Structure formats: structure tokens, C-alpha cells
UniProtKB/Swiss-Prot annotation:
This is Uridylate kinase. Its EC number is 2.7.4.22. Catalyzes the reversible phosphorylation of UMP to UDP. Belongs to the UMP kinase family.
């Protein structure tokens, strides 16, 4: 493996939707692509996982029982493929070499996930987008992102959100909410702090994978995090 820093960045599908709450806002897509390009230009090996909540959520689709949970989750996996293709387009328009790898075989659209091939792409400076979650129902894209990060030997997983990091309570509801700069995996799970679901956190803990939570809309913040800039704004779970 290369000596370069390797990171997996996890974006929610809702983040792509912008104010509309549904679909894909191409202005946001371009903003994210520019932030990723900064990392690649500065020598970082980057892979990405995007949720599908801007299109459909498996849990929500199955809520009234008309659609089975397994089918709902498969629909959600397909939504992540749509988002991944959109992100590939934005990154390629920015001059980057990109590959989408899906956990579910769909040769006409993208590659099938193979860890060795993903590693080779990253070593060649390509951005790799992992789509379709784990390929199995009942697992979130946070868990999929953690799994892929471990499989490809990522130094960290960055969860890009709409807030500056992890707070002791909801900063949108409480003005006195405090940003937690660092917390343990155990605290993140026991206090039910919504960093990721418990399966993802437990997987990260078992493999000593740091989880960094940051605001995706702070321009240049991703690069500051990777560069270990003191001005970087994030929380770390380790």
C-alpha cells in the first residue's frame, strides 16, 4: 500500500438534496466535488460512500407494511447507486479519475466491489465510490462505510454532516450545546450519541478505526482535517 494518507468520506443522501429535501442539488454536488478534489490534489487517497435518503429510505418505505423491509432496503441500495453515479459525474467534470464499485453486481453501470481492485484504483490516484451499501438488507450505509474503510485500510472515516461535530445535545434545539472534541467509542454508544448506528461504531472500535465528524459545508475543512491543521473543526471518536 502507498504511504499516502487514505480516507473514506461518508456523506448522507439528504445532504445532496439541499433545501428541497429530495433529489439532487447539483450546486451542492459541485461543492462536494471541489472539496474532494482538494484532498486528491494534495496527495490523499480518497474513497466515498453516499447514503440514499434523498431518494428513499428502506426503513421508511417499509413502515406501513406494504413494502417488505428487505425490498425497501434493496430500493435504498439502488438509491445509493444513483447518488454515486451523480457524484462520479461531478468529480470527473472536475478532472478527477473516478470508479464506482457496487456491492450488487450491475456491470452495465459500474464495477462490482473487489477489494484488491479498489486498492489498485486508490494507489493510482483514482477516487473510488462504494455503492449499494453492504449488499445486504438491515445494514445502514454508515455500517457499509465503516466496513469498506476497514477492508481498504483507511486511516480514518470522515462523516461529513451539517453540524461542526458531535454535541452533548442537539445544537439546533439547545443554545448551550457543547461541541465534544473527542469521545470514546464506548461513550458514543452508551450515551446514545448519534454519531453512527451502534453496529458501525462497534465495527470501528473492534478495528481501531477513528471516526471524525465534521461540517461538510465549511469550505476547506476536509483538507484542514487531513493536514492536521489546528483550525480544523471536527469531533473524533476513538
Amino acid at each position: 500500500m502507498s504511504d499516502k494518507k487514505r480516507v473514506l468520506v461518508k456523506f448522507s443522501g439528504e445532504a445532496l438534496a439541499g433545501d428541497s429535501g429530495f433529489g439532487i442539488d447539483t450546486a451542492i454536488l459541485k461543492f462536494i466535488a471541489d472539496e474532494i478534489k482538494e484532498l486528491v490534489t494534495n496527495g490523499t487517497e480518497v474513497c466515498i460512500v453516499i447514503g440514499g435518503g434523498n431518494i428513499i429510505r428502506g426503513v421508511s418505505a417499509a413502515k406501513d407494511g406494504i413494502i417488505r423491509r428487505t425490498s425497501g432496503d434493496h430500493m435504498g441500495m439502488l438509491a445509493t447507486v444513483i447518488n454515486s453515479i451523480a457524484m462520479r459525474e461531478a468529480l470527473e467534470r472536475g478532472g478527477l479519475d473516478v470508479r464506482v464499485q457496487s456491492a450488487i453486481k450491475m456491470e452495465a453501470i459500474c464495477e462490482t466491489f473487489i477489494v484488491g481492485r479498489a486498492n489498485r484504483h486508490l494507489e493510482k490516484g483514482r477516487v473510488v465510490i462504494f455503492a449499494a451499501g453492504t449488499g445486504n438488507p438491515f445494514f445502514t450505509t454508515d455500517t457499509a462505510a465503516t466496513l469498506r474503510a476497514i477492508e481498504i485500510g483507511s486511516d480514518m472515516i470522515i462523516k461529513a454532516t451539517k453540524v461542526d461535530g458531535v454535541y452533548d445535545k442537539d445544537p439546533n434545539k439547545f443554545k448551550d450545546a457543547k461541541l465534544l472534541k473527542s469521545l470514546s467509542y464506548e461513550k458514543a454508544m452508551s450515551d446514545d450519541i448519534k454519531v453512527m448506528d451502534d453496529t458501525a461504531i462497534a465495527l470501528a472500535k473492534d478495528n481501531s478505526l477513528p471516526i471524525l465528524v465534521c461540517n461538510m459545508f465549511k469550505q476547506g475543512n476536509l483538507l484542514k482535517i487531513i493536514s492536521e491543521d489546528a483550525k480544523a473543526l471536527y469531533s473524533i471518536v476513538k
